[in-house]
């Protein structure tokens, strides 16, 4: 693995200045996961570094970039539709540059489709190419030809890429990239590549800078944060990294995502228990409640092992809450398998579930598996699952009433005159307060609940 630092490209900056009568504007739209959102922030930072301003409407832009997601095929089709809708704008606006980057651009069939069917797309580069964007723009401006990079995964981590963060008090901080798990339903390892971890010193430096800049919540990102450290010269795992970061003085809290159950450890739970800066919430995607299906998914754990981890966390971290991902209707799922999922959901008592009806993803092993279950039956199972989960979540929320809690105030609530914030257990509360509190911590007494949203009163 090679570690390099981003360098300002003055040649690109000069070409950008020369190409436009007024400072050009860029519109960047990111689809998908939090990692993509963070990539989008870095893309914006790189563009600003070579002289672009940023705008919120594509029709105002001189450069339009779609930072894409490849997890689901219908998401890809939506992107192609949005790119197609720009054809007329491209014809009307002289010099408009259109680009597509991110996970979709790391697939050969996508690049070929763009090459053949979308001649007005000027730039294409993958997830590892953010630091090369100035060079690609310079090449386009110099040669006036399309620059479509072939999919490639670089054994490189680029540090100190400029960034334009969307929030002034919440920040994303990637600690690793890629995934080695190859779950049979998932395209991510094929488009984001194998796992590669940032050096702990580089992470610590960025983290310390965020704390010193006043950020109140920092979320550590990785496709599987629990496997952090593999391949590093230093013997450091994810729990070690958390303890290292929590030693930084300041008023902040840390979240992280995503945890893979096969790599989650007692050592991680012990860190959550010991460190006040770590939020007492664990997102632990189980996917289903059937050992047989977990094996078909290539998840490498059993329901028994998963429950042992849940029970250990409950014992060590009083009040900890859990969330998870569930796939309904995976190929071969029987009613008995689904009942296992319902039982697991009831047993764990998740505060929140992210649920999906299985959709075939070309390029994955699951796409080749027989899938005889009718769509209507899958939809019925999803309805039953959501009913069970809604009852569990509402009951857990009601149990919070009466507590006085520390809340990070994030924005406006749904009701007039209210603000919204999150507890460290990831629940949302609304309360009347001055908007000046946004981005700070507040003490809130929980007085009631509306469905899965808590209601409270500001403590003064």
Ranges and model annotations:
Residues 1-228, 267, 278, 282, ...:
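Proteins enriched for Cys/Gly/acidic motifs involved in redox and nucleic-acid/cofactor modification
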Residues 183, 220, 256, 284, ...:
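Conserved, mostly hydrophobic/aromatic
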Residues 368-460:
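Terminal RNA-binding accessory module
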Residues 95-100, 107-109, 212-335:
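Conserved SAM/AdoMet-binding glycine-rich loop
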Residues 70-71, 192-193, 232-235, 295-302, ...:
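Short glycine-enriched, charge-decorated loop/helix-capping segments at active-site entrances
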Residues 333, 349-350:
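Contiguous mid-protein beta-loop-alpha structural module that forms a pocket-lining wall or clamp
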Residues 355-371:
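Aromatic/acidic polysaccharide-binding cleft in carbohydrate-active enzymes
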Residues 166-169, 179-181, 278, 288, ...:
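Short flexible coil/turn linkers enriched for glycine and charged/polar residues
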């Amino acid at each position: 693995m090679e570690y390099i630092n981003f360098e300002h490209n003055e040649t690109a900056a000069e070409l950008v200045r020369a190409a436009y009568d007024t400072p050009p504007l860029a519109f960047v739209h990111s689809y998908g996961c939090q990692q993509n959102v963070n990539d989008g922030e870095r893309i914006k930072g790189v563009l600003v570094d070579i002289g672009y301003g940023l705008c919120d409407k594509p029709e105002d832009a001189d450069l339009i970039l779609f930072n894409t997601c490849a997890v689901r095929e219908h998401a890809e089709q939506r992107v192609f539709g949005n790119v197609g809708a720009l054809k007329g704008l491209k014809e009307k606006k002289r010099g408009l540059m259109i680009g597509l980057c991110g996970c979709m651009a790391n697939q050969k069939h996508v690049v070929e489709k763009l090459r053949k069917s979308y001649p007005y797309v000027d730039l294409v580069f993958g997830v590892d190419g953010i630091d090369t964007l100035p060079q690609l723009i310079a090449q386009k401006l110099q040669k006036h030809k399309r620059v479509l990079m072939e999919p490639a995964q670089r054994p490189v981590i680029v540090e100190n890429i400029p960034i334009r963060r969307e929030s002034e008090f919440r920040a994303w901080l990637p600690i690793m990239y890629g995934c080695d798990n190859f779950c049979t339903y998932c395209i991510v390892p094929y488009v984001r590549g194998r796992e590669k971890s940032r050096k702990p010193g580089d992470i610590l430096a960025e983290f310390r800078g965020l704390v010193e800049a006043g950020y109140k919540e920092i979320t550590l990102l990785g496709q599987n944060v629990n496997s952090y450290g593999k391949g590093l010269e230093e013997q450091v795992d994810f729990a070690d990294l958390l303890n290292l970061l929590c030693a930084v003085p300041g008023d902040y809290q840390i979240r992280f995502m995503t945890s893979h159950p096969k790599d989650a450890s007692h050592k991680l739970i012990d860190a959550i228990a010991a460190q006040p800066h770590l939020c007492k919430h664990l997102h632990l995607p189980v996917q289903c409640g059937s050992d047989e299906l977990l094996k078909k998914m290539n998840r490498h754990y059993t329901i028994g092992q998963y429950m042992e981890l849940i029970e250990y966390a409950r014992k060590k971290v009083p009040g900890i809450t859990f969330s998870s991902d569930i796939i309904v209707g995976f190929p071969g799922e029987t009613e008995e398998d689904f009942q296992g999922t319902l039982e697991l959901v009831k047993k764990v008592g998740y505060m929140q579930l992210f649920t999906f009806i299985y959709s075939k993803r070309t390029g994955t092993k699951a796409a080749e598996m027989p899938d005889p279950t009718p769509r209507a039956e899958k939809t019925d199972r999803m309805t039953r699952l959501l009913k069970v989960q809604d009852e569990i979540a509402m009951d857990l929320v009601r149990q919070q009433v009466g507590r006085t809690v520390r809340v990070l105030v994030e924005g406006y609530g749904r009701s007039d005159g209210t603000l919204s914030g999150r507890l460290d257990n990831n629940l949302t509360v609304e309360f009347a307060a001055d908007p000046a509190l946004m981005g700070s911590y507040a003490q809130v007494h929980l007085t009631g609940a509306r469905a899965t949203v808590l209601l409270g009163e500001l403590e003064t």
